Regions:
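Extended catalytic-interface subdomain
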Residues: 193-204, 223-225, 247, 284-319, ...
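Alpha/beta-hydrolase-fold serine-hydrolase catalytic core, especially in secreted/extracellular enzymes
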Residues: 20-117, 122-128, 240, 310-395
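Mobile cap/lid helix-loop segments that gate and shape the active-site cleft of serine hydrolases
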Residues: 247-305, 326-334, 342-347
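Structural recognition of the beta-strand scaffold that forms the well-ordered cores
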Residues: 132-135, 152-157, 221-223, 243-248, ...
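Hydrophobic h-region of N-terminal signal peptides that target proteins for export
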Residues: 10-18
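Primarily recognizes the serine-hydrolase "nucleophile elbow" in alpha/beta-hydrolase
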Residues: 200-265, 294
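Cap/lid segment of the alpha/beta-hydrolase catalytic domain
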Residues: 135-218, 251-260
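Sec-dependent signal peptide recognition
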Residues: 2-7
Length: 395
């Protein structure tokens, strides 16, 4: 009798989880489902409470329907304290066209126009409309992962919005193309600007439709490595039309928790913490307000940036050979973020693979299976298992 009851309970649990997952969207057709929610109160930095552990990403959330508001609150906090405002754009401000295989998007704000261009490389297999993987400045993932799959690829050229790069010439803060459109947001960090630019490309794809672009806008992924891995994560977190985010070796300011990196710095490690990151990417006030032990006053941490991707799919790729990348801080952040997906019965939509013994941004073949599984399931809709992708080696 006991065995029968246990079997029935197990079946009921599995059925409930399956039903819950089937009702949870894989992607949305709007950039921000939380646009109707007002921003929460934003205290001055020195009035924020000290939070030693990673903040609770699910604070106040009991069911999935409550996640939209919590996700919106997290997004507002990240913009206010971390990267600056990502401004909304009305459909009539965007005009898109195809020039051969190049998507061209003109965005008008006031009297200013910013033009984005992205060449689309169509696959040699399959039929349109195709899934699309967009690389933030480039796709660092090996080409063979896409060559035999019906997935188009494109590049978001970040310099068209903000041309900052760590090496070489670039404009100063307040002098970028984005700043022509939004002079009041000249203090923004690059990641808010780049996320804005990615969203405008997706606006263009939606506006033209699959008949013109040959792209299935329900199956768009973004990926990048290093600084561009952070970029991919911010783009995916702040645009719910992106079905899959693959953040490759994103380092500090990406998936690695600021709090954990601060503690590792105190322990003698040399990594990208909130004091040593590149402040062209973030609000300069973030360093002023949250340097050193003040990081514990930050009302969020990077696990919540990751969690903003939920209920969509996220794969984090690490490389512990490079201490600077702070994978020891990314792992607890990833574990904390995954609890959000798990709460809603969709834990198999988020995973990580942290493996060393290879160059920076050079994914080894040993990590191909994890990437292939996420691409196949979330871009191509194939029946592939992605549960329990929590691989950690050499850390």
């Amino acid at each position: 009798m006991k065995k029968t009851v246990m079997a029935m309970l197990t079946l009921l649990a599995l059925t409930t989880a399956s039903a819950q997952e089937s009702k949870t969207p894989l992607v949305y057709d709007v950039e921000n489902t939380g646009s109707k929610f007002a921003a929460p109160t934003m205290p001055a930095a020195d009035q924020l409470p000290v939070i030693r552990e990673l903040p609770d990403a699910l604070e106040g959330v009991k069911k999935f329907k409550g996640w939209a508001k919590r996700r919106s609150d997290i997004g507002h906090m990240i913009q206010h304290y971390g990267i600056g405002t990502k401004p909304a754009v009305k459909p009539e401000q965007v005009k898109a066209r195809m020039d051969g295989d190049t998507l061209v998007v003109d965005v008008t704000v006031g009297q200013e126009v910013l033009t984005l261009k992205s060449h689309i490389r169509y696959p040699k297999t399959g039929q349109a409309p195709y899934a699309l993987m967009i690389g933030t400045d480039m796709i660092a993932l090996p080409r063979q992962l896409f060559e035999d799959r019906p997935i188009a690829t494109a590049t978001f050229v970040s310099a068209q919005v903000n041309d900052y790069k760590q090496f070489g010439k670039h404009h100063d803060r307040g002098e970028h193309n984005f700043d022509r459109l939004y002079p009041d947001l000249k203090d923004n960090g690059a990641y808010s600007m780049w996320a804005w630019g990615m969203s405008r490309l997706i606006d263009g794809l939606q506006q033209l439709g699959p008949e013109v672009t040959k792209i299935d806008t329900k199956h768009i992924g973004v990926t990048g490595c290093s600084y561009a891995g952070k970029m991919a994560l911010y783009c995916g977190a702040f645009d719910e039309r992106i079905a899959l985010v693959i953040a490759q070796e994103p380092g500090g300011g990406g998936a690695a928790a600021w709090r954990k990196s601060h503690e590792s710095t105190l322990a003698g490690k040399n990594l990208e913490d909130i004091d040593k990151t590149d402040y062209h990417w973030f609000l300069e006030s973030q360093k002023e307000n949250f340097r050193g032990d003040s990081v514990y006053r930050l009302p969020y941490d990077q696990h919540e940036l990751c969690a903003m991707v939920c209920p969509r799919a996220l794969l984090l790729l690490g490389n512990p050979d490079y201490e600077w990348l702070a994978d020891g801080s990314m792992l607890p952040s990833a574990e904390a973020a995954k609890k959000v997906w798990e709460r809603f019965g969709i834990g198999d939509r988020m995973g990580w693979s942290i493996v060393g013994k290879h160059g920076h941004c050079r994914l080894p073949e040993t990590q191909f299976p994890e990437v292939q599984a996420f691409i196949d399931r979330f871009l191509l809709g194939r029946d592939v298992k992605t549960d329990n992708i929590k691989r950690v080696e050499d850390l």
